[in-house]
Amino acid sequence: MEEVTRSVLAEEILKRLDLENLCSVACVSTTLRSAVVSGVLPSLTSLDLSVFSPDDETLNHVLRGCIGLSSLTLNCLRLNAASVRGVLGPHLRELHLLRCSLLSSTVLTYIGTLCPNLRVLTLEMADLDSPDVFQSNLTQMLNGCPYLESLQLNIRGILVDATAFQSVRFSLPETLKALRLQPLLESEAILLMNRFKVTGTYLSQPDYNSALLSPSPSFTLQSLSLVLDLISDRLIIAITGSLPQLVKLDLEDRPEKEPFPDNDLTYTGLQALGFCQQLTSLSLVRTCYNRKISFKRINDMGIFLLSEACKGLESVRLGGFPKVSDAGFASLLHSCRNLKKFEVRGAFLLSDLAFHDVTGSSCSLQEVRLSTCPLITSEAVKKLGLCGNLEVLDLGSCKSISDSCLNSVSALRKLTSLNLAGADVTDSGMLALGKSDVPITQLSLRGCRRVSDRGISYLLNNEGTISKTLSTLDLGHMPGISDRAIHTITHCCKALTELSIRSCFHVTDSSIESLATWERQAEGGSKQLRKLNVHNCVSLTTGALRWLSKPSFAGLHWLGMGQTRFAGRKETVTAMICGQRPWLTLCFDGCELGCSDGWEFHTPQRH
């Protein structure tokens, strides 16, 4: 060590490591700690702390030496306004504040005052303020950030007031190239489009007649993403008429009731998308939880018109089109010759026939996601198995998928993500995957009721590569999974960082002990678990707490423990575990890994 100069150590070795490994290195010796603090941290220009939720003290320790940052990403789940304010400054060009469950919109005024040079801003906030207060703070922020090129504002909650962005159109900087807003009323979105108007007339009245606004040729928005109460023809026509230069359009709506026939999306709106001749990415999704509301006025003819109007699409995402059949979806696959990403949700008429000639039309496919498409069977997957560039294959809730297609999947040498949730696969199918060289890093077998402990052994205890590459594994809701499967995982998976075994009723304390022992004995290239979900594992006892305490699970960032015996002693468990690990997030609320779907409902007492 003495022979290696400090500069060589910093420049040639330490600066090549990510933050996680830098922290590990700094714990080895005072020499290495000094090299990290003085030689590496001051030179960092970008820092991403989204993988765990630091408290105030941890954040201060991490950022103390980072004096050259221009890009910062924070998981703000447990941070207050004062902590966030302390990291802001004119040096920042890019700022991402995620999961701000404790922050009111006052933080917007801090950003506008302290970060005048921002180019990129992302904010995920809970609904904590009245619309008037939020609008006032938002206006102040936008006026203080005149150079923004990308802006993402997501407000989440049960009853979010969709008028929160009512005045945003008056303050948006003309430098903006990418915009995402959630939530937004359709009527407000149309007024916003009028603000972006470049030439010609715009449509703001039901009869589509209105006066001209003064043109604003300086707006060059290329990416637009909106979560709305309604997607309609009026909205699409307003968007395409005002932003013909759009490259990416992402629209999702969540209507409370069935739209009126004259105020819904029809062929007219889909055909109008052709005015955006540079459009390469399109997402149209209708999401209605517990309600049967969909795009009922769109059938194959509407998709025919879309495929003819937008032949340059490289990414297509459609959800809530139950009347579109194979002919409609196949027209997209055949017309869009450069299609790389194809996602369809809830298409009840989509079957294997749509993919009959997929290699002859869309051989460039890299991602295919077919979620809740009940007519899709293994035959479609066999056809997709001929797409040699496929990297992501999502067949979640396609219940007719069986073992017969897994040999085809095993031939996909670039596949890194595979979702078989709810499929009718068995232990024999796991043997096919386990013997293959497919480099899968993310695998979901959730709800695969015919896969047992033996199947997990076939998957991971063979000569294939998956045991070496797998980093995320979901075995939730699988009645055939017990401690034996977990023991196999700890023995074979050296790269695993995320594991979900929620609602696995036969998993006991022995599994927690096995995972803890594996963590403590990890050597060489073995990684540590970062996220573990044992929600509703009813066979776990409070005796497993001893294995969740130090020194076990040293790298754990998130632990889901809802509906277990731990939940009955929430305060004691939180004090015992989080007292030793202030950066660890405990979730008793049934969230998926990392609370990606429910952070806005958490309170400080839960962390």
Curated annotation (Swiss-Prot):
Q: Where is the F-box domain?
A: 9-47
Q: Which SUPFAM superfamilies does the UniProt record give?
A: RNI-like
Record's keyword annotation contains Isomerase = no
| LRR repeat start and end residues | 51-76, 77-99, 100-125, 130-155, 228-253, 262-286, 295-320, 321-346, 347-372, 373-397, 398-422, 424-447, 448-477, 478-503, 504-536, 537-563
Q: InterPro entries annotated for this entry? A: F-box_dom, Leu-rich_rpt, Leu-rich_rpt_Cys-con_subtyp, LRR_dom_sf
Instruction: For this UniProt record, give its keywords in alphabetical order, as a comma-separated list.
Output: Leucine-rich repeat, Repeat
Q: Name one Pfam family in it.
A: LRR_6
Indicate what this protein is called per its UniProt record.
Answer: F-box protein At-B
